[in-house]
Curated annotation (Swiss-Prot):
Protein name: Putative cytochrome b5 B11H24.095
Origin: domain of life: Eukaryota
Organism in which the protein naturally occurs: Neurospora crassa (strain ATCC 24698 / 74-OR23-1A / CBS 708.71 / DSM 1257 / FGSC 987)
Entry annotated with the keyword Electron transport: yes
Single GO molecular function: heme binding
A single GO cellular-component term on record: membrane
Domain Cytochrome b5 heme-binding span(s) in chain numbering: 2-78
Keyword field contains Heme: yes
Keywords, sorted A to Z: Electron transport, Heme, Iron, Metal-binding, Transport
Gene3D superfamilies, per database record: Cytochrome b5-like heme/steroid binding domain
Similarity field: Belongs to the cytochrome b5 family.
UniProt binding sites for heme: H37, H60
InterPro entries tied to this protein: Cyt_B5-like_heme/steroid-bd, Cyt_B5-like_heme/steroid_sf, Cyt_B5_heme-BS, Cytochrome_b5
Length: 83
């Protein structure tokens, strides 16, 4: 089930128990993806709870989001957060 999050709600998910990131208007749970990330867990931990859109698109193409996004997406960013 997809949920709508505010930026402050996403910001609460920034520790080892629960890590969320924002990419475009999607919210992704990366908690169990840390060990699988080819670039290492360190960068994901640094972005946890934040908008990772710029960093993501700097290093990844659309195919990466298509491959992993469906598994990791837990919701969307609330309209009010898009300023």
């Amino acid at each position: 089930m997809s949920q709508t999050f505010t930026k402050s709600q996403v910001a609460e998910h920034k520790d080892d128990k629960s890590m969320y990131i924002i990419i475009d208007d999607g919210v992704y749970d990366i908690t169990n993806f840390l060990d699988d990330h080819p670039g290492g867990a360190k960068i994901l931990k640094r972005m946890a709870g934040k908008d990772a859109t710029k960093s993501f698109w700097k290093y990844h193409g659309k195919s990466v989001l298509e491959k992993y996004g469906t598994k990791l997406k837990v919701g969307t960013l609330a309209e009010a957060a898009k300023l």
